[in-house]
Each structure stands twice: as C-alpha cells, then as structure tokens.
C-alpha cells in the first residue's frame, strides 16, 4: 500500500520514507501491524470499520478483504484439496485463497486436457494403422464417392431424358 502523510511516504510493510521538500531522504522501518484474530473480517487499513459517516481527508477507505465464496468457489476449493468437506469451508475467506485455488484448478484442468490429447493421438494412430491394414485411405474413399455421384448424375440425366 502506498500512502503519503505530510512529508512521509508509507510504502507498506512498515517501510516509511521521508520525502518532504528539503528533507534528507531516509527510510525507517516501523513494525508491521499485528494481524487481526482469525475469523474476524480484515480491513485494508488494519483497523475496524467506522460508522462515523464520511471519512476525512487523508484517511484510507476501509474495504473488507474477505468475501463469501460462491458454490462454484466452494467446489473448486474442495477439488484442489484446500478443504476436505463443504462443512469445513468458512463463511468468509480471503480472495487470495480463492485465486490460489482457481489457479490450481486451472493447472489441473490443463493437465487433464493434455492427457486426453495424448490419448486421442494414440487412438488416431491405432485407427490409421488398422485402416492401412484394410487398404483404406482418404483418397480411395473420395474417388469411390465421386464415382458414385457420377453414376447417380448419369442415371438422373437418363431418367430426365425419357
């Protein structure tokens, strides 16, 4: 998070840089704020939500960093092995957890598609070898089909001429 307060520039993770006009550039490290207890909603400013109306100048908007997972998200969380059952999934989870689970699901789906593609390639190879044993080819099929069409066209022309 990047926030300017007076002549200080807070870069997040406790790093503060003094950047006022004429001030020497120095970086100080402040201890990072403690994480809230598990189960309570997190907020981007680190504090609890305030219901005092409009916020003043220089304050950060407090946005909840946890959200309710949809049924699809729950299925992805189960499929990727993050949780063992639907009952274990909490009502609110961090979006990073959902993103990580979606990425893992995407990779698993790609691996499945790669495997199916390899299986399909082997199936085509086997069927092509069997067709060669029967002396079948696309060229012979096309020639036979066109010969049949010519015969049908000739019969239709004879029937029309009568």
Curated annotation (Swiss-Prot):
Any single Pfam family the record assigns to this protein? DUF1075
Tell me where in or outside the cell this protein is found.
Membrane
Among its keywords, does the record have Transmembrane? Answer: yes
Keywords, sorted A to Z:
Membrane, Transmembrane, Transmembrane helix
Q: Which residues cross the membrane?
A: 107-127
One GO cellular component term: membrane
- Renumbered to this chain, region (Disordered) spans 26-69
As for membrane topology, the entry says:
Single-pass membrane protein
What PANTHER family does this protein map onto?
Answer: GROWTH AND TRANSFORMATION-DEPENDENT PROTEIN (PTHR13674), PROTEIN FAM162B (PTHR13674:SF3)
Similarity field? Belongs to the UPF0389 family.
**What name does this protein carry?**
Protein FAM162B
Task: Give the gene name.
Answer: FAM162B
């Amino acid at each position: 998070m990047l926030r300017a307060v007076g002549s200080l520039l807070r870069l997040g993770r406790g790093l503060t840089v003094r950047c006022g006009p004429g001030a020497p550039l120095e970086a100080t490290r402040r201890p990072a704020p403690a994480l809230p207890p598990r189960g309570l909603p997190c907020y981007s400013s680190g504090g609890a939500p305030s219901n005092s109306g409009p916020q003043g100048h220089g304050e950060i908007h407090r946005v909840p960093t946890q959200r309710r997972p949809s049924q699809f998200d729950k299925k992805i969380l189960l499929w990727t092995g993050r949780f063992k059952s639907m009952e274990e999934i909490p009502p609110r989870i961090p979006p990073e957890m959902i993103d990580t689970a979606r990425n893992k699901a995407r990779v698993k789906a790609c691996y499945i598609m790669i495997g199916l593609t390899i299986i399909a390639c082997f199936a085509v190879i086997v069927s092509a070898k069997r067709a060669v044993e029967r002396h079948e080819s696309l060229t012979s099929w096309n020639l036979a089909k066109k010969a049949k069409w010519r015969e049908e066209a000739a019969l239709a022309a004879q029937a029309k001429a009568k």
